[in-house]
A protein has these predicted regions:
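A cross-kingdom marker for long, charged
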Residues: 2-8, 13-36, 40-74, 81-92, ...
Length: 388
């Protein structure tokens, strides 16, 4: 007789197969609609366990740079619809709505910046510059995957043996993090990820807070940056290095350098501070095993704002035992509108969030699996099982 664990595993496997089927159908339909020149830009080599040959698939960004692939603006409207169908296949309804809103925020940001920001292209803030690429043959016997990314969005999916096996790194950002709408409620795409974390930290007693709060000020960015592989001791990356290639225009290089330097100076961090919040194999902060029932409910709700980005059954199921392995770390004040950062880290889990730039109105959030981002683990196993 099947146990509950067996039934849950079977249900998750079925969900991952159904999602892979939807992805394959959507990817094939999009590729079939492209002309040869578009298709050449839209496709890449099949995923591989070899880091060198798989390097492009493992490259990701969250800055307004070329993320690799065919840009939305280089597609006809009917092709764009098919592209968004593929994007939606890898997201929950709430996840898709959030991504669509983030893309539209580039129009809002253009207004905030006075329509004058120049990134060396025709339009500095451009919702047409989100890029989609398919790696390998959708639905084929070999592993395949797809990536969608642009300013403040990065989605990375891998399918092996007809099953979705990786959905990380998964990055959502928002600039502005809060902007006015008609009526009393502002537009805040990442409100849940910020408000639930603040509520959780503010619920801690003095002893818990002393362990959770690493510093009274926040770093300028997420600590892991856009690294393909995370390592013990990783520290914040300078803004100019989170772009594809080097800036050919000295003026743009100077602009990005000054922006990064300004963010770093505003953080007030010195070398010891960076070391304090550096990534580590042993999680920093407060073990959540000691949280009370109400606090654990808050933590689960917070985790859902990350793990709920993808369709049901694709994110890891964190039972009580898995939850007990998570640590909560916070840096910065806890007041509304103040720069802050937090991290949730446990086995096969790293979540980072910061809202520090633009006077704490520019947020970054990322969900990662340090051991298996991009499907490192399953690609190696697939290679061993199917090749001499």
């Amino acid at each position: 007789m099947d146990t509950t664990v067996d039934r849950d595993a079977a249900a998750r496997d079925a969900a991952a197969r159904e999602a892979a089927s939807r992805m394959a159908a959507a990817a094939a339909a999009w590729l079939d609609a492209l002309d040869p020149a578009q298709r050449a830009v839209a496709t890449g080599g099949a995923p591989s366990a070899d880091a060198e040959s798989d390097a492009e698939r493992r490259r990701w960004f969250y800055t307004p740079t070329d993320h690799g692939g065919l840009a939305l603006g280089a597609q006809r409207p009917a092709q764009q619809r098919l592209a968004f169908r593929l994007v939606a296949s890898g997201l929950s309804v709430a996840g898709y709505n959030t991504v669509a809103t983030i893309i539209g925020l580039d129009n809002v940001l253009d207004l905030v910046e006075g329509w004058r920001v120049d990134w060396g292209r025709e339009r500095g803030r451009d919702p047409g510059l989100y890029y989609l690429r398919v790696f390998g043959e959708p639905g084929g016997a070999a592993p395949w995957g797809w990536r969608f990314g642009g300013h403040h969005v990065s989605l990375n999916n891998l399918v092996v043996d007809g099953v979705v096996r990786a959905t990380t790194p998964c990055f959502f950002g928002a600039d502005p993090a809060s902007s006015p709408l008609l009526g009393p409620a502002p537009l805040r795409p990442l409100a849940g990820a910020e408000d639930l974390a603040r509520e959780l930290v503010c619920s801690l007693d003095p002893g818990q807070a002393a362990r959770a709060v690493l510093l009274d000020r926040a770093p300028s960015d997420i600590v892991g940056g856009n690294r393909s592989l995370l390592s013990d001791g990783d520290q914040v990356i300078h803004l100019r290095d989170i772009w594809r290639g080097q800036f050919a225009d000295p003026g743009l290089l100077d602009l990005v350098t000054r922006m990064g330097d300004g963010a770093e100076q505003a953080s007030g961090y010195d070398a010891a501070d960076h070391q304090r919040v550096a990534l580590s194999v042993s999680p920093k902060g407060l073990p959540v095993a000691g949280l009370d029932t109400g606090q654990r409910d808050l933590l689960r709700a917070l985790l859902a704002t990350y793990l709920g980005r993808v369709p049901d059954g694709l994110a890891p199921a964190l039972d009580d035992a898995a939850l007990d392995g998570v640590h909560l770390a916070w840096a910065g004040p806890t007041g509304l509108g103040e720069p802050h950062y937090y991290r949730l880290q446990g086995p096969r889990l790293l979540i980072e969030y910061d809202n520090t730039q633009r006077h704490a109105n520019h947020a970054h959030s990322v969900w990662r699996d340090p051991a298996a981002d991009f499907g490192y683990d399953v690609l190696g196993a697939h290679l061993a099982a199917h090749h001499l």
